[in-house]
A protein has these predicted regions:
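Secondary-structure end/capping motifs
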Residues: 105-183
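Conserved C-terminal helix/tail region of periplasmic/extracytoplasmic solute-binding proteins
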Residues: 174-200
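Residues that form or immediately flank small-molecule/cofactor binding pockets and catalytic motifs
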Residues: 19, 47, 86-87, 195-198
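Pocket-lining segment of extracytoplasmic ligand-binding domains
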Residues: 42, 49-138
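Short coil/loop linkers at secondary-structure junctions
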Residues: 31, 36-38, 79, 141-145, ...
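A generic structural-conservation signal
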Residues: 18, 39, 64, 82-83, ...
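Bilobed "Venus flytrap"/periplasmic-binding protein-like clamshell domains
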Residues: 1-75, 168-173
C-alpha cells in the first residue's frame, strides 16, 4: 500500500502480535497516530510463527510484526513494510536491565556494564552486514541481506543508542505505553525505580 496512512487500519483486518509488550506498543503507536485500537478488526492468530503463516496464507489486510519478519515478507513478495511503530512512538525504555540495589553495587554488575557498553558501541559502529553475520544463527529462515537491512533500519532509528542509562523521557514514554494498555495502574516515579548504571 504505497499510499498507506494509519487511519486505513480502522475497519481493516489486522493480524496483531498479542504478546504483552508488542501488543502494548502497537496499541499505543496506533493511538499516537490518531486511530483507536478498538476500530481495528484485530486478529489473534497465535504465535509469531503462526501470525506469519496466516498472513502468507491470505489472512488479514495488515500484519503487525517485529523485525526482521516484516522485512522478510517484503523480500518474499508477500507484502510491503508500510509503517513503523517505533517511529510512531519514539524512544522508549522497554528493553531494560533490572537488578537489586545490592547487585548494582557489586563488582559483577560493573563487569557486566563494561561488557554491555562495549556491545552497545559495537552495534552502533559496526556495519549492518557484520552484525547480521554474527546474529544470523538466531534468525533461521531470514535472508542475510534482509537481516542486515533490518539492523540498518534499527541503527538509524536509534534503537541501540550508545548511552546505557535510562533517560527520564524514554522511561516516561514506557509508562505511557503500559498505562494505555492497562498493563500498569499507576505511574511509578522515575527516581524510585531507575538508578544510574554502575561505573564500568
Amino acid at each position: 500500500d504505497a499510499d498507506f496512512t494509519w487511519d486505513k487500519l480502522s475497519g481493516a483486518d489486522v493480524l496483531a502480535d498479542h504478546g504483552g509488550q508488542p501488543l502494548a506498543m502497537f496499541k499505543y503507536g496506533v493511538h499516537k497516530m490518531g486511530v483507536e485500537y478498538g476500530s481495528l478488526n484485530a486478529i489473534d492468530a497465535g504465535t509469531t510463527a503462526e501470525i506469519d503463516e496466516a498472513f502468507r496464507s491470505g489472512t488479514g489486510q495488515y500484519v503487525h510484526q517485529q523485525g526482521p519478519a516484516p522485512q522478510q515478507l517484503e523480500a518474499d513478495g508477500v507484502g510491503h513494510v508500510v509503517a513503523s511503530v517505533g517511529e510512531a512512538i519514539g524512544p522508549v525504555a522497554f528493553s531494560s536491565i533490572q537488578g537489586t540495589r545490592e547487585f548494582v553495587a557489586s563488582d559483577l554488575a560493573s563487569a557486566f556494564i563494561r561488557a554491555y557498553r562495549k556491545s552497545r558501541q559495537w552495534v552502533n559502529n559496526a556495519s549492518a552486514e557484520e552484525i547480521a553475520d554474527k546474529e544470523a544463527a538466531f534468525f533461521p529462515g531470514i535472508d542475510r541481506s534482509v537481516l542486515a537491512d533490518t539492523i540498518r533500519f534499527y541503527q538509524g532509528l536509534g534503537c541501540w543508542n550508545p548511552a546505557v542509562e535510562i533517560s527520564r523521557s524514554s522511561y516516561e514514554t514506557a509508562l505511557d505505553v503500559f498505562l494505555h494498555s492497562n498493563l500498569i495502574t499507576q505511574r511509578h516515579d522515575y527516581d524510585d525505580v531507575v538508578v544510574a548504571p554502575p561505573a564500568g
